[in-house]
Amino acid sequence: MAAEMDWDKTVGAAEDVRRIFEHIPAILVGLEGPDHRFVAVNAAYRGFSPLLDTVGQPAREVYPELEGQQIYEMLDRVYQTGEPQSGSEWRLQTDYDGSGVEERYFDFVVTPRRRADGSIEGVQLIVDDVTSRVRARQAAEARVEELSERYRNVRDSATVMQQALLAASVPVVPGADIAAEYLVAAEDTAAGGDWFDALALGDRLVLVVGDVVGHGVEAAAVMSQLRTALRMQISAGYTVVEALEAVDRFHKQVPGSKSATMCVGSLDFTSGEFQYCTAGHPPPLLVTADASARYVEPTGAGPLGSGTGFPVRSEVLNIGDAILFYTDGLIERPGRPLEASTAEFADLAASIASGSGGFVLDAPARPIDRLCSDTLELLLRSTGYNDDVTLLAMQRRAPTPPLHITLDATINAARTVRAQLREWLAEIGADHSDIADIVHAISEFVENAVEHGYATDVSKGIVVAAALAGDGNVRASVIDRGQWKDHRDGARGRGRGLAMAEALVSEARIMHGAGGTTATLTHRLSRPARFVTDTMVRRAAFQQTIDSEFVSLVESGRIVVRGDVDSTTAATLDRQIAVESRSGIAPVTIDLSAVTHLGSAGVGALAAACDRARKQGTECVLVAPPGSPAHHVLSLVQLPVVGADTEDIFAQE
């Protein structure tokens, strides 16, 4: 019988060991049993959670908000299997100190703790709070986003190539919300064989996910040809079966395309019928409105060249039901048996849909975006991934009713329309860039109706209407009952507004008649797909809290502007610029970062200020971050604009 260990001699005196454990600067935690009850914590942990009395408490009771963020699942695996686990820069949201839920990032190692007989009694964690490091990197990445397009394209050449071959966006349609994410496994295999598509065809929506055997440029070339061939067939109105049969015939002309797999589904907007074919591809995951998840039945079709034909099956999707298409990289993950991995995917998606899983802080407004992004991050961060991953998700929704506004033809009409139009466009799911473009164009139409159509204020003189069609296009109109009156030529800024409106949207027309003027626009809506090389990477998109009230703050050589700069406020800005710059003699910087709308009148004032500075040999610097409404408009009219902190970025680089 082995001699009992002399703990004092081998490990150290108990009091010394406890004191050393207490003063180690890393967070150390000991948990016991299947419920992971706290049995030991050191000073670093208590300093991190000073108000929580944890010893003796189960971890799930101490941090209930972590349920569904995959941390407890990891502790369970270590306790059950004895295999250590680790995480790098895991994002976790919970109440750490009794002050409310907050988001922090951690590196950690979880290892089993065994009894003398070898059985596992608990787990222990070594944890490092790396929140400051992650946020500093994220801030640097956000600043880099403000560099020139040339610099970004060089830095992200692999992603740019992927976006050139794949669908860069998904449509916005009245009967469904759509989201897509493409996760690149590694930089040197960025040109892979996965692809996705979403086609809005008026009465139906077609979703496609496919996978070509292999990686690299050859697989990407094959993928691109198959994607184009299938897209042409679907766009021509052929059924799912007919389109797949045509691509199966075509694949014989494309070396390397045999055994490519596809999953194609078609949603009828009216009935909710979802017809699909799994051509050698994993079946979609259906997450119902009540947050239950199941895989739909495979249809029995094989990959291209298999000769099995392309039978289809149907499901009826109710309002709130979501369907998730994916490639095998999502379920064939390192260290996970396929059966366990597919079950984990379904369970996680269901918990996120129910609200019990996933992240709660800064969550996307649309449930489908949260389902996509949280599923990828939480599913893959515990195992990693060694293949590209595509996730295309769609949730059926009730269509938003068309917009109809009747308002008085007054100088404030455009401001009233902008507020209601922004709200309606956000409700139908439009991206912020499309919202800015449409709001700008309609605002110009309304201002022209007031200025050119009526000599005085007219009650209910303007009608604005907008609707989203099943082909993904917004069609909007501004109608007045006045008689069009041209202004004299040569007036500063005249004629710029309608030209800007036409440039911002897909199509714009103005028709004058005896009964008034009708201005119409058609604009195709889309939302960008997300292309990343790391589930933790979240590109900084321009985010702006809408406060359209015009405010300008003037300090030495600098004017900071917030809100809408339109025909009613541009004159104020023009005067402030003239005074601060002494009519162009003194240099001036105009910060437009918080501008919510920059109309043609505002552009005219800024153009005049730049022209005065040029003639006087001084500078008028316009500042607006890329993605902001002001940056978008100024780039369109080719007025020089710089992003915030651009000079500091170049100095750092």
From Swiss-Prot:
STAS domain ranges (all copies): 546-653
Disulfide-bonded cysteines: none
Outcome of substituting S600E: Does not affect ATPase activity. Abolishes autophosphorylation
Post-translational modification remark: Autophosphorylated. Phosphorylated by PknD on multiple threonine and serine residues. Phosphorylation is antagonized by the phosphatase activity.
One Pfam entry name: PAS_4
UniProt-listed Enzyme Commission number(s): 3.1.3.16, 2.7.11.1
Co-factor binding comment: Binds 2 manganese or magnesium ions per subunit.
Dependence of activity on temperature: Optimum temperature is 37 degrees Celsius for phosphatase activity.
Record: residues binding Mn(2+) 2: D211, V212
Residues engaged in binding Mn(2+) 1: D211, D328, D387
Residue ranges of every copy of the PAC domain listed in the record: 86-142
Region annotation (Anti-sigma factor kinase region) ranges: 397-544
Activity regulation, short description: The phosphatase domain is activated by the anti-sigma factor kinase domain.
SUPFAM superfamilies listed in its UniProt record: ATPase domain of HSP90 chaperone/DNA topoisomerase II/histidine kinase, PYP-like sensor domain (PAS domain), SpoIIaa-like
Induction profile: Induced by heat stress.
Entry function: Primarily acts as an independent SigF regulator that is sensitive to the osmosensory signal, mediating the cross talk of PknD with the SigF regulon. Possesses both phosphatase and kinase activities. The kinase domain functions as a classic anti-sigma factor-like kinase to phosphorylate the anti-anti-sigma factor domain at the canonical regulatory site, and the phosphatase domain antagonizes this activity.
Subunit structure: Exists in solution as both monomer and dimer. Both the phosphorylated and unphosphorylated proteins form extended dimers. Interacts with SigF. Can efficiently bind to SigF independently of its autophosphorylation. Interaction between SigF and Rv1364c is reduced significantly upon the phosphorylation of both proteins by PknD.
The name this protein goes by in its record: Multidomain regulatory protein Rv1364c
Organism: Mycobacterium tuberculosis (strain ATCC 25618 / H37Rv)
Lineage: Bacteria, Bacillati, Actinomycetota, Actinomycetes, Mycobacteriales
